[in-house]
Amino acid sequence: MGTEQSRGAPLKPLDDPTPLTGPTIDVGVRIGWLLRMARLTAPERPAHRLGDMVTRLEWLGLRTSTSSLHRIETGAVRDDRVVAAYEEALALAPHSLRASIDIVCRTFPYSPVDRAPVHRVASPEEMSRLHEPVLAGDAVGGQWREWARAMAQQGNVGLPVDQARDRVSALMGELVRSHGTSYLIRYDALATLRRSAWGGVVREAAEAVLADPHVQMPNDVMSAVGEAFDDDTRSWMVDLLGDPRELLVEGAAIGLGVMAEAHAAPGFWAPVLDRVVAHYNAVAQDQGERWRWLSHVLRLVPADELAAVRGDVAHPPSPVGESLRPAGREALVRACQVHAEESSAALGLPYQPLLARLLFEVVGEGRSSRSHASALLLGALPGLRRVAVDAVLSIAESHPDPSVRERATSRGASLVHDYLPPTVRRRLQEADELSAREAAWLAIAGEQVDEAVLRRCLRTSDQLFGPGRVLSVIGIAGSPVLGEILEEPGWSDEVRGAAAWWVRTGTRLVDPQPGATDG
């Protein structure tokens, strides 16, 4: 795809200088790197020289210079106007770069501040235009995001609270079944509302979602709720750690992780740590997913705070694979570097050390908020997403440490979207038996999953409910098996309830690409 250059001189590849798994990351250099990768790897119109990009942006009415773009592409400056112009000039999905950057910058409160002036809706007519597709129920991702950003601005023409709550619930229903840029744009819309005066409405809508006894996909909703901190919501999430439904324990753990990262204040855990320990102690050692997620929450607590209550912890937390421990991490780091070398070459670029760092965080970072943010950056661009899928699924299939394979298998699903490596696709399509996670890769990629394989999974797997599990595969795929479950005798109330939830919620959602036509 060409050589990255500015005025004829090769640009030095960017890297994050902060310690691996340390307390902070360099957000600025990451978002600058994403913009550089967008310019160099755009599938239709890459710009291999900064001077070429300056010319394109001038065609769009944005006057700039190579030195200004260099500062933006190295993370020294953050400017949403330039990000929007990159999307247009490079023919990328509208809002894809802006949404991913906004999400990452919200997650880490020490992120660079956007110097672009906030666009304010200037008239009731403009606000009505933004309301229209949302109220009609046919908004695509970018329309959801524009609506949410306008709603979040004080003084705009909003909606009655009940109507707003209904629309937020609809957004949540779309979020949990969307993938790729369709997902990240909707997530940004929901998180934007959560961080606004409408945050309480988002919390109420989330409570209603979780009140359904058969809810199947709570994690993304809980993650978005966790983007804003208040004592009551923190307490509510801690209470959910004791919920009898394992799915909600997982969702609460993820929400608390995001809240702790985004809040970034010392003493976040102190007011609730005794209750966290009590929930942990109520679960027997080796008690499956519940024990694993409660162990995950304990690991989120700073070491000095956890040390103060360690004597109250009834038994050791779930083990971490050797390759995920500090002492054994070097081999996984090197594996990610090798994949980054191969991926960089596939993109026509010199070795990108920041790509290796992001790959490691997807598969090796214990904090789900960190891995989620890294996956969003890798998933924002078609070329990056493909090489990241190649790398993560290779680790999932071949790494010697089973704990690494399990984590890569699970987290790889967030990157798959519309692409599977050809060898992986062929193997899965020809297999008579698949794990739930493997079947999920096919379903998320929009590939047909054989009904006989799905039924075999349904009758033999112990992973039926929740993200990446058998019923989510059947639901995302829109398989006729869903309706058959509701008609056939012999299925448990829990299985029937989950199938009915998917029928109500809908199947895989991906926004139409700009310029696509029907037929």
Describe each model-derived feature in a short phrase:
Residues M1-R49:
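A short, Lys/Arg-rich alpha-helix, primarily the initiator
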Residues I25, A91-T107:
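Short C-terminal boundary/hinge segments that cap the last helix of small helical domains
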Residues A47-E58:
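Short alpha-helical "recognition helix" segments of helix-turn-helix
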Residues G51, S67, H95:
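Key DNA-contact positions within bacterial/archaeal DNA-binding proteins
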Residues R56-R78, I101-C105:
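Recognition helix of helix-turn-helix/homeodomain-like DNA-binding domains
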Residues A76-L97:
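DNA major-groove recognition helix of helix-turn-helix/homeodomain DNA-binding modules
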Residues R106-R177:
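Helix-turn-helix/homeodomain-like alpha-helical modules used for DNA recognition
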Residues A164-T517:
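Extended amphipathic alpha-helical coiled-coil/heptad-repeat regions
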